[in-house]
A protein has these predicted regions:
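Low-complexity, rRNA-contacting terminal tracts
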Residues: 1-80, 94-203
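Polyanion/phosphate-binding surface patch
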Residues: 90-91
């Protein structure tokens, strides 16, 4: 019986065969648990975390990301120049009929974080929790003047002047989703080149 790709041994540079162990990586298990937090170990952790988070100041800089899989997927690296900030925003509407900000809560948190830390640029953000009144997000921020960032070819694009104020211009992942740029073709005729170019009919 022929072995599958996962079971075939890997040949090293010295010519030795190193057997591979089929299985899933740690990021897969983290993502699986966060995909349905109410049915995994995350539920108990979140109950304890939210008690502490409610007492903390808003837009608090933290040492490590709560969701390592999402942080890495959205561009975070454990190196100098990267900063993780946890912020919260109120849930619900403005309580005025038919008057909305036309922005998702994630984008609002990103904009406020950018104002709180004007020397940093918002790279992306991800959801980490909610209760009956508030939503919590962790924002990945980058220092565009840090020498480590300037010398990294994978991220030094953010140091260029045209990328200033990414969050306020809707250029993050959450911003593009809120502007309808995840949709192409039929039904998306009025979202490009911009929402205001079509008198806001794209939303």
């Amino acid at each position: 019986m022929e072995k599958s790709e996962a079971e075939r041994p890997v040949t090293t540079e010295e010519g030795e065969e190193k057997p591979t162990v089929p299985g899933k990586g740690i990021y897969h298990y983290i993502a699986e648990a966060w995909n349905k937090p109410d049915k995994s170990y995350v539920k108990k952790l979140q109950f304890e975390r939210l008690i502490q988070w409610r007492q903390e100041e808003n837009f608090l800089r933290i040492e490590h990301p709560t969701r390592l899989d999402r942080a890495r997927k959205l561009g975070f690296k454990a190196k100098q120049g990267y900063v993780i900030v946890r912020g919260r925003v109120r849930k619900g509407s403005l309580r005025i009929n038919k008057i909305t900000v036309r922005k998702n809560l994630q984008r609002i948190v990103e904009e406020r974080a950018g104002k709180r830390y004007p020397n940093l640029e918002v790279l992306n953000s991800y959801w980490v929790g909610s209760d009956g009144k508030q939503e919590w997000y962790e924002i990945i921020m980058v220092d565009p003047y840090h020498p480590v960032i300037l010398s990294d070819p994978k991220i030094n694009w953010i140091c260029e002047p045209q990328h200033k104020g990414r969050a306020t211009r809707g250029l993050t992942s959450a911003g593009k989703r809120g502007r309808g740029l995840r949709t192409k073709g039929k039904g998306a005729e009025k979202v490009r080149p911009s929402i205001r170019a079509h008198d806001r009919q794209g939303k």
